[in-house]
Amino acid sequence: MRNLSLILFILIFTFLSVPAIAGQGALKLPEGSNASAIKHNKEGIFNYKQGYYEDALKHFRLASEDDSSVGESHYNEALCLHKLGKHGEATNHFYKARKYSKGNPAILGSKLINDHSPVKREGS
């Protein structure tokens, strides 16, 4: 009976944990961000959720151009670049995302960002 309880606990924990780590989606910009950047970021998130990574990337790049000091914009760019197999470019934006994260746990705790940029480099 004890073993059965342990097995059930492990199964329940596993199923509840998987959604939290399965997919890392694009992030909203922080409150108070540039209005144009927010608009482009929302368009990017919409396209990203649809699987239109090239279109999403265009919007995330525009959001970054509007305000390059927002870590979420760089993170979203990096997600698209990763999905498109452009891992070198993704790594550069993951470093920028970390640099400008302002402590955002969604960025700092991302497995994907830590896989791409595991060691701090100058400027990150």
Predicted feature descriptions by range:
Residues 49-50, 83-84, 116-119:
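Register position in tetratricopeptide repeats
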Residues 42, 76, 109-111:
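Canonical tetratricopeptide repeat
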Residues 61-65, 99:
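Conserved structural position within tetratricopeptide repeats
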